[in-house]
């Protein structure tokens, strides 16, 4: 290898040293100085792992002074290169730059530059890079992108709502599904879609204080979204970091009380430029035309400033018309400005709902009914469709569906309101109540008497709360020595029940964490019962482990002991036995407890066991819930309203349970009120809205399509290949689970999304649903997305050399495999990836410029090739550099045609789809005022921006592989 003083070389093994200069040569050794780092290296002259740096005409090089030169000609003088060309800063021509004056911090980013500089990658990394490009491009174009990655069952009505709303520009909608149908999951799916597509980057979730942790857990566990919880303490900390504390995080959860209490805080929230606002339990925002509440006004201020708003609320019929109007007014104050007009409109929708019912029933329509339909739809050329729908011909069913769709588009609040009911969604279990009446121990009787004397000044509500939990009264008097569990008959009953039902998984819920901890100790020490505990004092990871242990079929815990707050946001559909060790104070909390098991996907009827102590508030409450509200065995949409209306009387009975006079009459009155309210709710059901929200056959097809994707072996193969190459250890744990841990030889020191102590993953949705400690890996999971970014944002695998053993070709035949990427650079919110994601174009060129890629498929070709070590590869490249240059130039000429076709097709698709959506909404605007002007303007602006940016799409060489034929 001929060395000359002043020549520039690069190390094959330490490319981070930059450009080296030959500073000393003797008979056997050569010394290189690397000015960028100030280090020297001594190499053997005969076989040193270094590559001569030689640029070619067309390249741009940088001088040590920082200016750049576009190379036109390369001369050699006494073994040193001189580059002649045009200075890019002054445009001066015929400028000479000697190689000794090249910038030492030179970084080779183009694949061909890296190849010629000897920075040759492993062959498996090249293959991974191409697969990553291919898969990423395919995933971007999936129509249900953003709906596959969540750890949830694929429930059609949820997917339907998320698919409709999640793809809108700045969606402003009301999600009003009945309890247990998954409003939180629907909101999470919409948030996930908007974030993934780039339609939103900053999200604020405002919830009641008691639900903050539930949302935090749901967003993290189900959607891999890390929200920050803002309370007084976190807000104070963030004030040191930024003028506006809310600018310190992109995804924030805070309580409604936190928002309402402080005027400056609300101003900071309003100024924080959120893209999406989510408000849970929005029915608690009290409004009247004369006196809106402070909470309502606070959310109204936010809703005026934030483009996208999701309100989660109880069903409209539960709320009353005025309250329902108040929610809609937050979403679109221009459209919903007059309550009286709104009431009139709602009454006018009855014929529409009747028409839909007729169409769905499949019965023949009378002429009068056909005329009504024609008027309601208001299209000029609707007659043929009506005739087909009213016939027995082929296509009658699809014509009916199209008419239903047209009615839904044109009438009602279906664009802003989504509401599913349990009647309209199948798959819920029955609930059976088992009450166990137990005697009140004398120890409790004494403690209650003393408490009554000492607590005479307490309010009725405080006394009522005390009377619900007699063990706490006893413990207060006895202190640490008070062992209530030794005589409380509920403990004896619980132990007896658990020992006689060893094969059953049992969820036990009690109000306080201390009760759960004491019960766990008693069950373990007395009967050896395996019990996990779950309370608010535990971290999310600790709760995950407890939930996972409870979920294990054979070796897991038989019972999970939960506190009221600790169980929020967790669902255990695999269990069907629920024990309420005590009772919650209001019907909402009771429904929340039962809702841990009563979810879609529950395979068995739920057995609810309530052991209660006679002559206590428990005995009063169990009767009121069951006989007055029917709240144990059925969902109780009327519960809160009745609870509020009889609150004072109920508190009186709870505070003094021995006084039963008039209690039977109260129960009867509550039951009568419950039955009447429930009948009103049923009568007021809006079938049209339910059909729209449910999604019908279309929603089922969406769920089926995503389920089919769940079995994608391509993802598993790619992920394992990715983890291997990144250097992540994989340990098969069985049951479709793998443990990933970082290794000491990873491509990057910290792989984003992989904890220091590792994590358990699964590719199986059912396993992920039953094992909360296992992360559910899909194309949308951060581990995969971060892995794709890691590979594709750098130069990993961008150039390699392989040998092809093929005696049918002459030895030394060259092939060049080129991977070009066609892409359009644009702001993320334009979502150009729907039409033109970074798309790989593969070419396999011989020395004559023939493209063989069509005949030679990548994977089968890759299997025929063998790797070359870097040092040998550098020698090969040096020997064939001129030929490679010629083939590369031919490739540049050929790729333009393929790239142009891709860009033109993307432009056409974008124009067709966006124009069609705009035309549809503009036509509907005439008959449905729920279509907002700003939404139409945004779609038109978006269409223009998309087409403009697609016009500027370009292509570049992303990776290349030099293949040399051998016979050995």
Swiss-Prot record:
Domain of life, source organism: Bacteria
Positions that bind ATP: 177-184
CDD domains xref list: DEXDc_RapA (cd18011), SF2_C_SNF (cd18793)
Entry annotated with the keyword Transcription regulation: yes
Protein name (database record): RNA polymerase-associated protein RapA
Organism field: Cronobacter sakazakii (strain ATCC BAA-894)
Top-level EC class: hydrolase
E.C. number(s) listed in UniProt: 3.6.4.-
């Amino acid at each position: 290898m001929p060395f000359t003083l002043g020549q520039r070389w690069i190390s094959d093994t330490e490319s981070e040293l930059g450009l080296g200069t030959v500073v000393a040569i003797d008979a056997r050794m050569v010394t290189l100085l690397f000015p960028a780092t100030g280090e020297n290296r001594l190499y053997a002259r005969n076989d040193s792992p270094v590559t001569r740096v030689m640029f070619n005409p067309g390249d741009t090089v940088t001088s040590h002074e920082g200016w750049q030169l576009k190379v036109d000609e390369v001369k050699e003088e006494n073994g040193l290169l001189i580059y002649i060309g045009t200075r890019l800063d002054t445009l001066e021509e015929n400028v000479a730059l000697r190689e000794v004056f090249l910038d030492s911090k030179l970084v080779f980013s183009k694949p061909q530059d890296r190849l010629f500089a000897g920075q040759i990658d492993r062959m498996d990394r090249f293959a991974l890079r191409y697969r990553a490009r291919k898969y990423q491009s395919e995933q971007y174009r999936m129509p249900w992108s953003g709906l596959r990655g969540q750890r949830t069952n694929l429930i059609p009505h949820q997917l339907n709502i998320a698919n409709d709303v999640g793809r809108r520009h700045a969606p402003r909608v009301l999600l009003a599904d009945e309890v247990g149908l998954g409003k939180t999951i629907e909101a999470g799916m919409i948030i996930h879609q908007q974030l993934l597509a780039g339609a939103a980057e900053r999200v604020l979730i405002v919830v009641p204080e008691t639900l903050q942790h539930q949302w935090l857990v749901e967003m993290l566990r189900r959607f891999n979204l890390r929200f920050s919880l803002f309370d007084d303490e976190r807000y104070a900390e963030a004030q040191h970091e930024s003028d506006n504390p809310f600018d310190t995080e992109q995804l924030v959860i805070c309580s409604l009380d936190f928002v309402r209490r402080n005027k400056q805080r609300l101003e900071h929230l309003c100024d924080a430029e959120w893209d999406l606002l989510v408000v849970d339990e929005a029915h608690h925002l009290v409004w009247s035309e004369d006196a809106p509440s402070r909470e309502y006004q606070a959310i109204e201020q936010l809703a005026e400033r934030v483009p996208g708003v999701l309100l989660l609320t109880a069903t409209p019929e539960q709320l009353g018309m005025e309250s329902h109007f108040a929610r809609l007014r937050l979403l679109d104050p221009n459209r919903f400005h007059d309550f009286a007009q709104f009431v009139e409109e709602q009454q006018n929708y009855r014929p529409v709902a009747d028409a839909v019912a007729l169409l769905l029933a499949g019965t023949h329509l009378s002429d009068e009914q056909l005329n009504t339909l024609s008027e309601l739809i208001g299209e000029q050329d609707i007659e043929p469709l009506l005739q087909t729908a009213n016939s027995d011909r082929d296509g009658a069913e699809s014509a009916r569906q199209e008419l239903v769709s047209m009615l839904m588009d044109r009438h009602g609040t279906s664009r802003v309101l989504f509401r599913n009911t349990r009647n309209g969604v199948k798959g819920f279990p029955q609930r059976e109540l088992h009450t166990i009446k137990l005697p009140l121990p004398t120890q409790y009787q004494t403690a209650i008497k003393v408490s009554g004397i000492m607590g005479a000044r307490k309010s009725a509500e405080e006394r009522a709360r005390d009377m619900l939990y007699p063990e706490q009264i006893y413990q207060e008097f006895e202190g640490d020595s008070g062992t209530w569990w030794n005589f409380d008959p509920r403990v004896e009953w619980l132990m007896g029940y658990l020992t006689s039902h060893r094969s059953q998984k049992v969820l036990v819920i009690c109000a306080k964490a201390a009760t759960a901890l004491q019960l766990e100790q008693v069950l373990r020490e007395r009967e050896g019962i395996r019990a996990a505990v779950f309370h608010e004092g535990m971290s999310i990871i600790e709760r995950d482990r407890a939930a996972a242990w409870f979920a294990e079929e054979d070796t897991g815990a038989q019972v999970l002991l939960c506190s009221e707050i600790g169980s929020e946001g967790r669902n255990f559909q695999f269990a069907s036995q629920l024990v309420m060790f005590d009772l919650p104070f209001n019907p909402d909390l009771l429904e929340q407890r039962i809702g841990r098991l009563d979810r879609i996907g529950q395979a068995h009827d739920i057995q609810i066991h309530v052991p209660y102590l006679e002559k206590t508030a428990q005995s009063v409450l169990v009767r009121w819930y069951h006989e007055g509200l029917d709240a144990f065995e059925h969902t109780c949409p009327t519960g809160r309203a009745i609870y509020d209306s009889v609150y004072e009387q109920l508190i009186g009975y709870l505070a003094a349970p021995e006084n039963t006079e008039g209690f039977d009459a109260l129960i009867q009155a509550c039951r009568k009120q419950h039955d009447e309210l429930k009948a009103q709710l049923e009568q007021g059901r809006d079938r049209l809205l339910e059909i729209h929200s449910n999604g019908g056959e279309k929603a089922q097809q969406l769920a089926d399509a995503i389920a089919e994707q769940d079995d994608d072996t391509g993802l598993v193969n790619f992920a394992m290949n990715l983890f291997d190459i990144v250097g992540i250890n994989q340990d098969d744990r069985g049951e479709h689970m793998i443990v990933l841990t970082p290794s000491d030889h990873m491509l990057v020191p910290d792989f984003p999304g992989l904890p220091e102590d590792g994590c358990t993953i699964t590719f199986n949705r059912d396993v992920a649903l039953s094992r909360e400690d296992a992360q559910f890996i899909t194309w949308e999971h951060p581990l995969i997305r971060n892995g794709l970014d890691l590979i594709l944002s750098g130069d990993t695998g961008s150039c390699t050399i392989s040998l092809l053993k093929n005696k049918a070709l002459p030895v030394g035949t060259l092939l060049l495999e080129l991977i070009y990427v066609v892409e359009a650079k644009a702001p993320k919110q334009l979502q150009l990836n729907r039409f033109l994601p970074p798309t790989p174009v593969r070419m396999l060129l011989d020395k004559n410029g023939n493209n063989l890629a069509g005949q030679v498929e990548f994977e089968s070709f890759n299997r025929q090739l063998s790797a070359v070590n870097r040092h040998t590869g550098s020698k090969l490249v040096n020997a064939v550099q001129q030929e490679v240059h010629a083939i590369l130039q031919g490739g540049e000429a050929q790729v333009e045609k393929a790239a142009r076709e891709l860009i033109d097709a993307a432009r056409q698709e974008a124009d067709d789809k966006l124009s069609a959506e705009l035309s549809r909404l503009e036509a509907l605007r005439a008959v449905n005022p729920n279509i907002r002007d700003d939404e139409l303007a945004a779609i038109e602006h978006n269409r223009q921006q998309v087409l403009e940016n697609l016009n500027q799409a370009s292509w570049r060489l992303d990776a290349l592989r030099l293949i040399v034929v051998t016979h050995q």
